[in-house]
């Protein structure tokens, strides 16, 4: 163990003996996240796991880390896809799992959630008060702190935005141990610089989010899901554009093809219920008034048919909607074992069709399958580069970079919701420039003078 025994003893005095884990097998589960194996960094095993139970304990742990110049890696639910939680140097894994309280202030439609609370728990607690947290950025086992740190998005970002849009206030422990309390329960707050949003999307390099005030909404009374099949991608994208520019704002607008969605259904032991078509749009609608929902359903059906769709499948039944969404949501899991890397490219709305056609050109060039699906409603498209037989690691990275270039040529970016983490850091200087890098280094230097917090992430090496 590279960490001094005196540090370990002081950590035990701070959080309690049972919350400091040094046994190798127990530490193992804290060394990885969901990053695809082909691009995942190799973790170090010289790690101690510390589980604080309060903001005050987080503060004391960080003060000790500075005293001993020990590296600290923040651990949420382990659902990240870019290696952001993987320890790459000896140090402390700071797991926030004990800090999982959620309090709903129903009168003000605000949730006060600790960083270790899961997305699923937040949704469940809100529903007890006939309220909802509309965002659904993927895995419900993800921790609130991690979702904020990564500014997570997901399929429902079309109607209600990404995590940043919900954050009213934060409690943050700076790398040196000082505690910042930012924002309030109010919708509007123009008192001083909005430092809270400096930490949203900061990926754990500037501070540790320990608590958040999150905006909730009245629960939508009526929902419907309509899956529209097409015999060509062109017709699907024409319909998507038509819907987006009509003024209709769906809760979600998703694209996928038959091969991808049937792989997910098979993985779940289910059957995809739509027999026609090879390309699909899935439109999820949610409204307070049933009459409005019916008008929207009619419009989606009409607009799709005008663009040459096949027979749409619409349902208001809760069980059927959940099944459709479950199959869509498990695409990543179904493909995971064969995946070298999952890309998170995002392009302007009007260029989604051009981008996917460019990806299909790359697929044909290499004679491989590039599974494509995603949030067509906000331009965020996921592509899996698989472990193709006969391809070296360098060749697989080359395929990924061809896809990145296709997105960049259309004015897009290489990540829309997963973040930079460890695995995308090598592209930062080229894509964001020297001034961005130097500005971030200066900011990091002010907040984290001893460079203890989440090293090897986001900011390129000097």
Where on the chain are the PLM-derived regions?
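N-terminal accessory segments
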Residues: 1-38, 67-70, 303-320, 409-414, ...
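N-terminal flexible segment immediately upstream of the FAD-binding catalytic core
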Residues: 1-63, 80-109, 260-270, 318-342, ...
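C-terminal substrate-recognition/cap domain of FAD-linked oxidoreductases
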Residues: 22-33, 218, 229, 237-402, ...
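Short, ordered loop/turn segments at secondary-structure junctions
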Residues: 76-79, 99, 138, 255-258, ...
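FAD-binding subdomain of flavoenzyme oxidoreductases
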Residues: 101-105, 109-254, 453
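Activity-critical C-terminal alpha-helical subdomain
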Residues: 178, 425-462
């Amino acid at each position: 163990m590279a960490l001094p025994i005196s540090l370990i003893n002081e950590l035990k005095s701070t959080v309690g003996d049972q919350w400091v884990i040094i046994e190798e097998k127990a530490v193992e589960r804290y060394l990885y996240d969901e990053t695809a194996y082909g691009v995942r960094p190799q973790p170090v095993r010289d790690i101690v796991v510390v589980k604080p139970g309060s903001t005050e304990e987080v503060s004391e742990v960080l003060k000790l880390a500075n005293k001993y110049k020990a590296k600290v890696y923040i651990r949420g639910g382990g659902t990240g896809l870019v290696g952001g939680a993987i320890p790459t140097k000896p140090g402390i894994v700071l797991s926030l799992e004990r800090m999982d309280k959620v309090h709903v202030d129903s009168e003000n439609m605000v949730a006060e959630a600790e960083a270790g609370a899961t997305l699923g728990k937040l949704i469940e607690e809100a529903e007890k008060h006939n309220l909802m947290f509309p965002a659904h950025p993927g895995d419900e086992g993800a921790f609130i702190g991690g979702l904020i740190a990564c500014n997570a998005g997901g399929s429902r970002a079309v109607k209600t935005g990404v995590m940043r849009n919900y954050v009213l206030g934060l409690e943050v422990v700076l790398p040196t141990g000082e505690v910042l309390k930012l924002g309030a329960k109010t919708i509007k707050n123009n008192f001083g610089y909005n430092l809270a949003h400096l930490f949203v999307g900061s990926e754990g390099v500037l501070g540790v989010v320990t608590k958040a005030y999150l905006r909730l909404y009245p629960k939508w009374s009526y929902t419907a899901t309509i899956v529209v099949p097409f015999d060509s991608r062109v017709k699907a994208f024409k319909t998507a554009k038509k819907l987006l520019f009509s003024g209709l704002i769906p809760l979600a607008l998703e694209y996928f093809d038959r091969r991808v969605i049937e792989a997910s259904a098979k993985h779940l032991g289910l059957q995809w219920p739509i027999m026609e078509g090879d390309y699909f749009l899935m439109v999820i609608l949610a409204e307070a008034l049933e009459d409005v929902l019916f008008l929207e359903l009619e419009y989606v059906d009409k607009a799709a048919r005008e663009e040459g769709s096949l027979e749409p499948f619409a349902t208001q039944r809760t069980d059927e909607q959940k099944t459709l969404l479950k199959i869509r949501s498990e695409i990543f899991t179904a493909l995971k074992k064969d995946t070298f890397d999952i890309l998170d490219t995002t392009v302007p709305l009007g260029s989604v069709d051009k981008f996917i056609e460019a990806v299909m050109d790359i697929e044909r060039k290499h004679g491989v399958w590039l599974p494509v699906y995603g949030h067509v409603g906000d331009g965020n498209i996921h592509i899996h580069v698989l472990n193709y037989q006969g391809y070296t690691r360098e060749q697989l990275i080359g395929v990924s970079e061809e896809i990145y270039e296709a997105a960049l040529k259309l004015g897009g970016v290489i990540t829309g919701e997963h973040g930079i983490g460890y695995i995308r850091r090598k592209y930062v200087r080229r894509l964001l420039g020297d001034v961005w890098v130097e500005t971030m280094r200066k900011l990091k230097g002010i907040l984290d003078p001893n460079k203890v917090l989440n090293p090897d992430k986001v900011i390129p090496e000097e």
